């Protein structure tokens, strides 16, 4: 059979791979359940959407869609360089920050190597390592977040990479500046730390690290960020990495040509200039987080305190069943069973009316289980 032959020919890491499962799209829910006006609070998107300046920039380049994009992303790299105060040759662009997570692994990881990440980590980390045929080491979490001391102890001569998310997805926990820098200082130079800061713009904590200041001190540090979250450009897929220039050069060697499209490049460059949209997004998130967590407390539900734009809550029963019942009422959240949290669901902070709809439906669903 042709199908079974392909399964036999597939690389060992791919044969046993379970594909990454994104949040269910609204269109799919409405097709399956026949509901209208569904609310999606599953994928940590900005409920305000993109900056108007980003939308204008997209329209401005639509007419040039017949041309290939700037493969080096000069304009965006220049804007990022000015915004972040770092040289452009330390910046690598990706089709979402997931590209950068992969590029680093492809540059450094061979099957004999090991990669370390935390127990409750972004699902893509172990998937990437499995594809490459290397060994992944999930270090047990501490308080739903990273146990940095245990992660240092897990490092050996075969370790090449450590993934750290700050804030962490899916739990929303975060690492203080002093503990994270102590972790960096304790690692041998042959181990690259990929610091995933997809949600850093949402953090409002005095002890949250300004990691870019560490770049000259720790050449084995790479920072990844995205325009998919607070900048509201998830549908265009664009992110960036900041690293030592030599690592940036190596990642550009494995980066596919024209991996970032013209619309994304223009939108991201414009979005960097719209500070008002960024502030509005933060305010909406802070208000929405308070709205959700107050409701959880009123319902007697425990939640993991989060500094990001989502919160993970213990629904005191099967998270999968609660998720399915929420779907029937037209609300999409994210079940956490696949992350080892079978009684939890993760909820993106939405607009006030979206949060209110979710809270109302959650009350109904929980009552159905009583």
Swiss-Prot record:
The modification N6-(pyridoxal phosphate)lysine is found at residue 229. GO terms for biological process: L-histidine biosynthetic process. CDD domains: AAT_like. The keyword Transcription regulation does not apply. It comes from the Bacteria. GO terms for molecular function: histidinol-phosphate transaminase activity; pyridoxal phosphate binding. Its cofactor is pyridoxal 5'-phosphate. Pfam families: Aminotran_1_2. Gene3D superfamilies: Aspartate Aminotransferase, domain 1, Type I PLP-dependent aspartate aminotransferase-like (Major domain). Keywords: Amino-acid biosynthesis, Aminotransferase, Histidine biosynthesis, Pyridoxal phosphate, Transferase. Pathway: Amino-acid biosynthesis; L-histidine biosynthesis; L-histidine from 5-phospho-alpha-D-ribose 1-diphosphate: step 7/9. Its EC number is 2.6.1.9. It catalyses: L-histidinol phosphate + 2-oxoglutarate = 3-(imidazol-4-yl)-2-oxopropyl phosphate + L-glutamate. It is an enzyme of class 2 (transferase). Transmembrane segments: none annotated. InterPro entries: Aminotransferase_I/II_large (IPR004839), HisP_aminotrans (IPR005861), HistidinolP_aminotransfase (IPR050106), PyrdxlP-dep_Trfase (IPR015424), PyrdxlP-dep_Trfase_major (IPR015421), PyrdxlP-dep_Trfase_small (IPR015422). Homodimer. Belongs to the class-II pyridoxal-phosphate-dependent aminotransferase family. Histidinol-phosphate aminotransferase subfamily. This is Histidinol-phosphate aminotransferase 1. It comes from Nitrosococcus oceani (strain ATCC 19707 / BCRC 17464 / JCM 30415 / NCIMB 11848 / C-107). The lineage of its organism: Bacteria, Pseudomonadati, Pseudomonadota, Gammaproteobacteria, Chromatiales.
């Amino acid at each position: 059979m042709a199908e079974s032959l392909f399964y036999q020919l597939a690389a060992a890491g791919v044969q046993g791979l379970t594909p990454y499962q994104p949040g269910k799209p609204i269109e799919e829910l409405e097709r399956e359940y026949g509901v209208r006006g569904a609310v999606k609070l599953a994928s940590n998107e900005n409920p305000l959407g993109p900056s108007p300046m980003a939308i204008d920039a997209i329209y401005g380049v639509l007419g040039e869609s017949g041309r290939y994009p700037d493969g080096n992303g000069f304009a965006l790299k220049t804007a990022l360089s000015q915004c972040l105060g770092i040289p452009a040759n330390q910046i690598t662009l990706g089709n979402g920050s997931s590209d950068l997570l992969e590029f680093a692994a492809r540059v450094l990881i061979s099957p004999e190597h090991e990669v370390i990440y935390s127990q409750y980590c972004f699902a893509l980390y172990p998937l990437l390592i499995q594809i490459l045929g290397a060994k992944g080491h999930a270090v047990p979490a501490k308080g739903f977040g990273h146990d940095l001391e245990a992660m240092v102890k897990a490092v050996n001569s075969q370790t090449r990479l450590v993934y750290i998310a700050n804030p962490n997805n899916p739990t929303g926990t975060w690492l203080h500046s002093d503990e994270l820098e102590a972790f960096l200082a304790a690692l041998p130079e042959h181990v690259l730390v990929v610091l995933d800061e997809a949600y850093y713009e949402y953090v409002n904590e005095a002890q949250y690290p300004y990691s870019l200041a560490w770049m000259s001190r720790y050449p084995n540090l790479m920072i990844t960020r995205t325009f998919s979250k607070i900048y509201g450009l998830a549908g265009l897929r664009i992110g960036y990495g900041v690293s030592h220039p030599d690592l940036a050069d190596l990642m550009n060697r494995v980066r596919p040509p024209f991996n970032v499209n013209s619309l994304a490049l223009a939108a991201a460059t414009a979005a960097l200039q719209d500070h008002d949209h960024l502030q509005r997004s933060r305010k909406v998130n802070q208000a929405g987080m308070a709205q959700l967590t107050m409701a959880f407390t009123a319902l007697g539900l425990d939640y993991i305190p989060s500094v990001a734009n989502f919160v993970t809550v213990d629904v005191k029963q099967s998270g999968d069943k609660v998720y399915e019942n929420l779907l029937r009422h037209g609300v999409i959240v994210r079940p956490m069973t696949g992350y080892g949290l079978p009684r939890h669901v993760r909820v993106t902070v939405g607009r006030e009316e979206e949060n209110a709809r979710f809270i109302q439906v959650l009350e109904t669903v929980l009552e159905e289980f009583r």
